Amino acid sequence: MKLSNEYAWIIPLCPLIASCCTGSLSFFFPRVARGFHRLCALLNVFSLAISMFVSLAIFQEQFVKNPIQQYLWIWIPRSTFCVEIGFLVDSLTLVMSLLVTTVGVLVMIYSDSYMCYDRGYTRFYAYLSLFTASMLGLVLSPNLIQLYVFWELVGMCSYLLVGFWFARSSAANACQKAFVTNRIGDFGLLLGILGIYWTTGSFEISELCDRFAKLKEIGFSNPILTNIIAFLLLAGPVAKSAQFPLHVWLPDAMEGPTPISALIHAATMVAAGIFFIARIYGLISTLPLVMQASSWLGGATALLGATLALAQRDLKKGLAYSTMSQLGYMVLALGIGAYQSALFHLVTHAYSKALLFLGAGSVIHSIEKVVGYSPNRSQNMFFMGGLRKYMPITGTTFLLGTLSLSGIPPLACFWSKDEIIHESWLSSLPLGILASGTAGLTAFYMFRIYLLTFEGDFCTIKTDWVDFNHFAPLSISMWGETEGNLSLNQINQNVASVRLGITKNKGFSSSYLANPNGITNVHYDQSLPKPKESSSAMTFSLVMLAIPTTLVGLLGINLIGETANFELSPEWLINPVHFFELSKSFNIYIKILLNSRSSLILSFFGIFFSFIIYKKSYKYFYITKKLVGFTKLVSKFGLLVQSWSLNRGYIDYYYDICFVRNLRSLSKSLSDFDRYGIDGFVNVIGALNFFGGEFIRYGENGRISYYLFIIIFGAILSSVLIFIFLPFP
C-alpha cells in the first residue's frame, strides 16, 4: 500500500524527465548532444529501467489488493466542475505498465545499435522517452480528461516517430496519413467523453460506470442516446487500434524506424485502444447493441488483416497487417464478453509481435548493406531467403515468434488465441467460423514470412542483376555521412539491383506461387557480401523477448477450470514456488491440448500449405499433367489473392476516389473562392481607396486660381443639377 501511494507517480515521471533533458540538449546544444550521444541513450534506458522496477515492486505489492486511486493536485478548480490530476492503480494498470516498461527498455537497448549512425540519434531517444511517458500516463489516468490528454500525446509521438525520416516523402506522407486518420477517431472520442459527462456528471472512471448503470436501471437515460455515446467512445479505439475502416494508416506507419514499429505499432500504442475499451468495459457491457457491433467489427478486421497479409512482399507491412488482424481478435473477444481472454491476448501478442518486429529490423539492418538502403529492396522478402545460416540467433528467435503467433503450444499466443476461438464458437457460429478461419490464415502467412526470409537459399545472389550505374540505390538518413558513403561505395563495387517485374509466361507453371515475383533468369554471383548476424545489443533484446514469448502464456492457464483463462491475480504470480508445483500436473496440460485440437488442426493446415508453396523458394515446383487443371485454378485464385493483398483490398483506392479527391476538389474551390472572391473584394476596395486618394491628392497643388476654378465649376454644376432635377413652382 505504501509503494502504491507514494511512488506510483515516478513511473511516468522518469522517462518524461529523460525526454526533456535529451530533447533540450539536442535542440540547444546539437554538437554536445552528438558528442555525448551514448550518454543520452544511457540516461533514457536508465530512467525507463527505474520505472520498470517501480512498476514491478508495486505489482508485487498491490496486484492482489483493491484498486488505489489518488489525486496529486487540482487542475481546474471550480465549484460545479473540477478536474484533478492523479493516478489509478489496479490490476489492469499494473499489467499495462509492466508491458510498456519491459518492452520499452529492450527496444531502447536495441535502438542503440540500430540507430547508432543516424544523425537524429538523440532526437530519436527524446521522442521514444516522451512516448513511453505518455503511454504510462495514459494507463495510470483515473479520469477521462487526463486519459484524453495522454491519448493525444501518444498520437503526437506516433506522428513524430513515423515521420522521423521526414526527408523521405513517403515517411512525411505516412505520418500525415496516420495523424489525419487518428484525428477522425479522436474527435469521436472527445464527443463521447463530453456526452458521458452530460449524462453522468462525472469524468471519473471509477464512478461513471456505476452511475451509467444506475441511470439505465431507473430508466432515466435515453437508450438511443446512450448507444450513440458508446459508439462515439469506441471511435477512438477503432482508429488507434487500426480497426476497419480506420485501419489504413497502420501499414504506411512502417515508414518509421523498425524499433518504433516494434514498440508503438505492435506492442503498446495500438493496444491503447484495447486498453481503453477494457477500462470502460463496465459501461459498454450494459449495451448489447454496442457489444454485438464490437464483436462483428473485430471479427471483420481480423479476417481482413489476415487476407491482406497473405501476399505482401514488404516484411514490415506483412507484420503490420498481422498486428491489425490480432487486434481484431481482441476487439472480437471484448465484444462477446471474453474480457480476460482479450487482455491475455493483448499481453501475449505484444511480446510476440515485438520480437518479430525487432527480428525484422535485425534482418533489414543486415541485408541493406548488400542490396542497398532503399526500403523497396531491403524490406522485400524476395531479396532474402536462407538468412538463418547467416543470422542464427535472429532466425531462431523469429521462428519462436512465428510459432507463437501461429498458435503452436506451449508458446504464448496459443493459450490466448485458443480461448478466444473457444468463446467465439460459444457466442455465435459465424463469429466462430471467422475466428477459426483467421487462425488458419495466420499460420499460413506467418510461416510464409519466415520461409521466404530465413529458409532456402540467399536469393540476392541468384537474381538477374543490372549495373548500379543505371539503377543507383536510394540512401536514407538512417546512416551518418561517413558510414553511409562507405557503405554505398562498397555496394557500388558490386552488381546492383533486382528486377522486380512480373514476367508473363506462355505456359502455366505453379512456380509462380513459389516464386511470386516472377524471376526466371537466375544469375549466381558469389562475390556479393553476405549478411551477418546483428550486434550483441540487438541480439540481446531478441533473446530477452523470446523468454516471455515462450513462457508468458502459462500465466493464463487456469488449472482448476482446465481452460486457458487469464486470471489477473493468480497466487503463483506472486510466489513462483506455486508455479513449479502446478507445472507438475501434466494430465491437465494434455486435456487442454485435446480441447484445443480443432484450432491446432487449422494452424497445422496453414503451416502445411505454406511449406508446400514457399519451402522451395526460387525453384520450380513441377507437377504432373493430371494436376494441370487443378493447379490452373489454384493459380488464378493465387493471382486474385495477390492482387487483393498488394492493392490493400482496394480500400485505399476507393477512399482516394470517394474522399481524398472530393476533399481536394472542395478545398481547391474554397481556396479559389477565398482568393478571388473574399480577398478579391477586399483588394478592390483597397484599390479604389488608393486611386481615390491619389486623385484627391493632385487637387492639393497650392494654386488659388485652381481652387477658384473648382469652386465656380462646382457651383455651376450644382445649379444645373438643381434646375434639372428639382421642379420650380
From Swiss-Prot:
One of its GO terms (cellular component) is chloroplast thylakoid membrane. It comes from the Eukaryota. It catalyses: a plastoquinone + NADH + (n+1) H(+)(in) = a plastoquinol + NAD(+) + n H(+)(out); a plastoquinone + NADPH + (n+1) H(+)(in) = a plastoquinol + NADP(+) + n H(+)(out). It holds the Pfam family Proton_antipo_C. NDH is composed of at least 16 different subunits, 5 of which are encoded in the nucleus. The chain crosses the membrane at residues 9-29, 39-59, 87-107, 125-145, 147-167, 184-204, 218-238, 258-278, 289-311, 327-347, 354-374, 395-415, 425-445, 540-560, 592-612, 627-646, 676-696, 708-728. One of its GO terms (biological process) is ATP synthesis coupled electron transport. Its EC number is 7.1.1.-. Belongs to the complex I subunit 5 family. This is NAD(P)H-quinone oxidoreductase subunit 5, chloroplastic. One of its GO terms (molecular function) is quinone binding. It is a multi-pass membrane protein. The keyword Membrane applies. It is found in: Plastid, Chloroplast thylakoid membrane. NDH shuttles electrons from NAD(P)H:plastoquinone, via FMN and iron-sulfur (Fe-S) centers, to quinones in the photosynthetic chain and possibly in a chloroplast respiratory chain. The immediate electron acceptor for the enzyme in this species is believed to be plastoquinone. Couples the redox reaction to proton translocation, and thus conserves the redox energy in a proton gradient. The keyword Translocase applies.
